[in-house]
């Protein structure tokens, strides 16, 4: 199996999984600033971006998790309990498992995700994501 650009692929999967989800009960639609820090192979990769979260995103949980999933991945299993949220899914190519937990409020959320890369000696990648509402969408 090729390992070229593997950290980039894994980061893209993790960020898209985390960054496109919302809290149906608590999160208020609007413009959010997302900040992620992903640690893989001893390197920390920071990413920041802004995203407009709509009421549809909130109602479908897609502000936190890409509900279509990634190619070769199961759809995310999203569970909500009040302000707490958990997400799990697996991928077959490359073979990985994702397990994350987070806390949601009306104008912010935080999320921690652990990704196990099974084809790379069960290497663990961790992503921490925070998002803060900046105001209405522009």
Residue ranges of each PLM-predicted region?
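Bacterial N-terminal signal peptides that target proteins for export
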Residues: 1-11
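N-terminal signal peptide c-region/cleavage motif recognized by signal peptidases
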Residues: 19-21
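Cleaved targeting-peptide boundary
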Residues: 23-31
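Short, surface-exposed coil-to-beta transition loops
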Residues: 46, 94-100, 112-114, 123-128
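Extended lipid/amphipathic-ligand handling interfaces
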Residues: 100-104, 133
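Edge beta-strand at a domain terminus
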Residues: 119-138
């Amino acid at each position: 199996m090729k390992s070229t650009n593997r950290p980039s692929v894994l980061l893209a999967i993790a960020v898209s999984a985390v960054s496109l989800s919302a809290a149906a009960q608590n999160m208020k639609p609007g413009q959010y600033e997302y900040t992620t820090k992903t640690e893989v192979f001893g390197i920390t990769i920071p990413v920041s971006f802004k995203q407009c979260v709509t009421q549809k995103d909130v109602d479908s949980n897609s502000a936190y998790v890409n509900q279509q999933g990634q190619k070769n991945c199961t759809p995310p299993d999203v569970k909500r309990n009040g302000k707490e949220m958990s997400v799990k899914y697996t991928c077959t190519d490359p073979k990985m498992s994702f397990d994350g937990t987070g806390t949601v409020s009306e104008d912010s959320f935080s999320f921690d995700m652990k990704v196990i890369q099974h084809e790379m000696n069960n290497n663990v990648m961790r992503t921490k994501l925070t998002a803060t509402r900046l105001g209405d969408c522009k």
